[in-house]
Amino acid sequence: MSGNSIGQNFVVTTFGESHGKALGCIIDGCPPGLAIDEADMQHDLDRRRPGTSRYTTARREPDQVKILSGVFEGQTTGTSIGLVIENTDQRSQDYSNIKDQFRPGHADYTYQQKYGLRDYRGGGRSSARETAMRVAAGAVAKKYLKQVHGIEIKGYLSQLGPICAEILDFDQVEHNAFFFPDAAKLEQLDEYMRELKKSGDSIGAKVSVVATNVPVGLGEPVFDRLDADIAHALMGINAVKGVEIGDGFAVVNQKGSEHRDLMSPEGFASNHAGGILGGISSGQPIVAHIAMKPTSSISVPGESMTVQGERAEVVTKGRHDPCVGIRAVPIAEAMLAIVLMDHLLRHRAQNMNVESITPVIGMK
């Protein structure tokens, strides 16, 4: 009811605030026998954690995850997996000036109205700091998906402000601080971000995520369509204002003869649908994109109001990302993994013994 959990068979529940003692999560429904340890999660946590480059927040958190339960002798037991990450680099005094003010564009005002109070330190529960636990849980899902089903999930920054990737080279993604797939644009990105930081402003971004080797048949009609659940999960990431599956909003300008993905026994001719037909996976790569707004935590003064309803001018202090899309890449991967993991378990529960006379496209 309180909106802190996602999933039906693979359930992830997170807790914690930006400046609290720790962040944590509980994973329910992970099958037993999966070899897992902290190192499996730490790789993605290190990709997401703050303070790793000059393009992200200066807050330095090691984000060392600890497994509290659900794993014995290196394997999942089938019981609840408890995870925790301690907060070690809070500077709550940076937020004392906004204790009685609302930052425009943030959740300060809406949290105050909903709950009658709020944790003003770094945004409290509304902070993207919470996503560290999603990444940890997503790493568990990613390992199961790859080890048991051969499913791989990769994300990348496809656009930062006006700069778009024209080449998709996954080999480049993990070798630059932007998670950007087009090496020819890296110098341009660097210059753009340096000028942006000088101005004290921020910028939006587009993040893309792709899952390959997904089997046919995942997704439930009508309200638990696979694309609906993916959109729900991705939309739940902080700062996301739009989600596209496949060609997304570009379909507005497409004709039916162009958009339909023609099929033959050898394979599909295209993938405008993004790997999902009728809410069910088609066996093609699942492709999703998210649009992320520019953070409102900037040093440019802005008009707002106080808790008492008086006019105020707000200048956000503290340490913030000038572009939240950069560190969102592993978060988007994690959310897609959690949804696919959940739907795999749901599909197995109901349809494990289903046999179709129709061959899988591309497998003949």
UniProtKB/Swiss-Prot annotation:
Class of this enzyme: lyase
Pfam family, one: Chorismate_synt
Disulfide bonding pattern of the chain: none
One GO BP: chorismate biosynthetic process
Reaction it catalyzes: 5-O-(1-carboxyvinyl)-3-phosphoshikimate = chorismate + phosphate
Cofactor stoichiometry and binding remark: Reduced FMN (FMNH(2)).
GO molecular function: chorismate synthase activity; FMN binding
Cofactor: FMNH2
Keywords, in A-Z order: Amino-acid biosynthesis, Aromatic amino acid biosynthesis, FAD, Flavoprotein, FMN, Lyase, NADP
Binding sites annotated in the UniProt record for NADP(+): R48, R54
Assigned GO CC terms: cytosol
Record EC number: 4.2.3.5
Protein residues bound to FMN: R125, S126, S127, N238, A239, G278, K293, P294, T295, S296, S297, R319
Pathway(s) where this gene product acts: Metabolic intermediate biosynthesis; chorismate biosynthesis; chorismate from D-erythrose 4-phosphate and phosphoenolpyruvate: step 7/7
Signal sequence region: none
NCBIfam families for the chain: aroC, PRK05382.1
Protein family: Belongs to the chorismate synthase family.
Its job: This reaction introduces a second double bond into the aromatic ring system.
Assembly mode: Homotetramer.
Name of the protein: Chorismate synthase
Organism of provenance: Shewanella loihica (strain ATCC BAA-1088 / PV-4)
